[in-house]
Each structure stands twice: as C-alpha cells, then as structure tokens.
Amino acid sequence: MPIRIPDQLPAADVLRTENIFVMSETRAASQEIRPLRVLILNLMPKKIETETQFLRLLSNSPLQVNVELLRIDDRPSKNTPTEHLDNFYRQFEMVKNRNFDGLIITGAPLGLVQFEDVIYWDHLKTIMEWAKSHVTSTLYVCWAAQAGLKLLYDLPKKTRKEKLSGVYHHRIHKPYHPVLRGFDDSFLAPHSRYADFSPEYLAEHTDLDILATSDDAGVYLATTKDKRNVFVTGHPEYDPHTLHNEYIRDLGEGMEPAIPVNYYPNDNPDNPPIASWRSHGHLLFSNWLNYCVYQQTPYDLDHFSEEAFTKDE
C-alpha cells in the first residue's frame, strides 16, 4: 500500500522515479479504509532531504499511511526554503488536540550540546510528554533516542571522545520479538553520532528490551515493554551518500574526521560507497508500523486510551 502525502511535496516526484507507490490526496480520499496517521517531527537542518529518506522507508508496507510533517518552532531555517516549511509543515499548536498512530522524531546535529542548552529543549519535552497520551508508538532516531531516554528514564548524556561514523555490524538478542521479525542474526546499519549507548548501562538503569547491539557502536535498537517507545541509535534512513556528504562537510570545516568505517570500498573515499543497510532499514520500519503501530492502535483514534494497550509480545 502507498503513503499519502501532499501532491506538491518535493519528495513525491523523487519517490515516483524510484517506482514507490505514492497516492495523491484526491485518490486516497475515495478509498474506504482507515489509514494510519503518522507524524514526523523533523529536527534535521536539511528537511527536504530528511523527509524524503523517511518517506521512502514508510512506503514499503502493506498499510496505507497518511504522513504529516511537524516543525519544532517557527524560527527561519538556513537550509530549507520558508515557502516549503509554510506549505508542508505544521506547528505543534495545530496538532496538539489530535491523536496519531505513530510519531517519528528524527535525529539532530546536537551531539556535543547539553540538553539544557538546546534552544528548543523545553518545547521538545512538551511534545514528548504530549505523545504519551496522544500517540500509539513513538520512534526516536539517533539524537532523539538520547533525548527520549533522558525524558523517560532521566539518563544523563553520555558522549564519546571521537565521533562514531560508519556502517557497523549488529547482532540481535531477542529473535522472537515482533520488531525483529525477519531480521538476519547479523545485519549492517549506519551510525553518525557522538552519543554513547552502553548495553550494560542501559540494562542497569532501564527496563528496556535491548534488541540489537554492536561491539563497536553499542546499543542500536531497544523498546519499552509495551512497544510504545522504540529507540534507534543509528540512521537506517540514510541515503547511500549521506555519510560521504557529512565526511566532506567536516573536512571542509577544517576538522579531521576519521574515514567512515566499513563504508567506502577499500576505505578509499574516492570509491563510491555501497549501501549495505537498505533492506534492514525497510524491514525495521515495516515491523514498527505493523507490530508497534497497526496491531496496537485503536480503530477510532478519537477514543485513544493509554490503558487500552496490551503489553504482550
């Protein structure tokens, strides 16, 4: 089934060229089906690039998904046209009285910034708190995972000395967990972060189900028992060249970044990178939509109730 997005959203043309089924709002309105409502809080600077990446992963599901885009505040963006934000993004005040099946909170380039120094930290806390009573399942990605763990478990920020960048091997720990259905025992996924997610630390200080870890990258995937909060510390949504673009950017800014691990053939940045994580990313999002959202959400979102959710796996 397709994703439903505004007809004029730039991502629509990109996805159609990839033979991804994008349904127009007009056609979707004629179907007698209750689509899933998914809200994306986009915290990344290059919003058009990021929204396209997430929409691509949401499209690979038998479920019809209505996607709405949310911005954290009304400050002008240096990397996204104001017209685009005005046309396709909503303010929190416009959605706070509604319920959603799913919420995705993207990463943000704030790895070395303390939470209290993030200009929109209080607003982000408000949205995360709101999600508890208005969203069936929330997916926290990269920096958002660290922010979510701070809000839900009051975990302090832990930072690596060197940035983690590259494509890392991971192994699964609960093969029968719904979020892991269809996963290989070992899989690859990209990381680009300073945050440190130690399996031992999370196991000691939270009751999370730790689903996948890496010897080098730490915890990659974890969920609360009720699957209403899913934490992904990497970037399964990344395009093949995203890590490359970040590497070139950091070089241009006079930094001395390490070459992303297991990314360029022969570790040579002159060689085009190979996307070895694409199938994993699609499966992860498909499982989240099916088992954490669709199987748990009420048919009538107007009668949303936290007590209605089962905690069975």
Curated annotation (Swiss-Prot):
Keyword Signal found: no
Site for Important for substrate specificity, residues: S192
Catalytic activity: L-homoserine + succinyl-CoA = O-succinyl-L-homoserine + CoA
Pathway membership: Amino-acid biosynthesis; L-methionine biosynthesis via de novo pathway; O-succinyl-L-homoserine from L-homoserine: step 1/1
Top-rank taxon, per record: Bacteria
InterPro entries: Class_I_gatase-like (IPR029062), HST_MetA (IPR005697), MetA_family (IPR033752)
Keyword DNA damage assigned: no
GO biological process, one term: L-methionine biosynthetic process from homoserine via O-succinyl-L-homoserine and cystathionine
UniProt-annotated location(s): Cytoplasm
GO molecular function: homoserine O-acetyltransferase activity; homoserine O-succinyltransferase activity
Similarity remark: Belongs to the MetA family.
Full protein name: Homoserine O-succinyltransferase
Species per Swiss-Prot/TrEMBL record: Vibrio vulnificus (strain CMCP6)
Gene field: metAS
